[in-house]
Amino acid sequence: MQAIKMYRMALDQIPSTQREVQFRIQRNIGNAFVRLGQFQNAIQSYERVQEVQADVQAAFNLVLCFFAMGDCERMRSSFKKLVAIPIEDPVGDSAHVVSGVDADSSDDDDDGDDDDDHDLRRRRYFESGTLETELESRRMRATEYITTAARLIAPVIEKESWIEGYEWIVKTLEKSQHSKIGSEMTIAKSLQYLKEKRFKEAIDVLKGFEKKEKDLMARAANNLSFLYFLEGDVEQADKYANVAVRTDR
């Protein structure tokens, strides 16, 4: 409780212009309440951050709190809010700006030198190690938070059946900008079938990846090879092992 008191004193000293610092302190207050097992107080701290700014870390922490409390309905609502937070695409942003500059320069050949200088400044702004790298780092952190939250709550959000929980997670992700994580969760669903020795269902799920992206297809083929090997079907096991090798070279 002493740490929380000190955090609140610090929060009172931070000017309103330094919102990022305020958010970090508010998140730390929530983290301290989590350590004390006071999840409702932690939720209030994280929600204060969310009210002002969509924050991936605070949204993820809310999912964890509702998971700890066993509140399935609020797990679903908080997960929806987490995946709805917009994540900037560094590749898309840089490509858009650079292509936009090229388009402008082609309109007026008389200003070619000025356009070249402007193009150079833009390229330096987006070169590796600057904004582009920071955006990529944020995207990777957001992906990790969302994937972890999805794996955590998928088996428990539907009390009647873990299968329905995975299906809800996959559908929610496919409707968002994180459809690839939805594919990851489909593979996780097949592994859950495997844990329960329901090989046929696991195989059916994995076969749906035969026309997907190469990295997902390779992983699915690798798992299919293993499943067929467990069932004693050496021919099919060899077939999918070769598919995995060819796809992931």
Where are the language model's segments positioned?
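Non-TPR docking regions that flank or precede TPR/alpha-solenoid scaffolds in eukaryotic proteins
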Residues: M1-R249
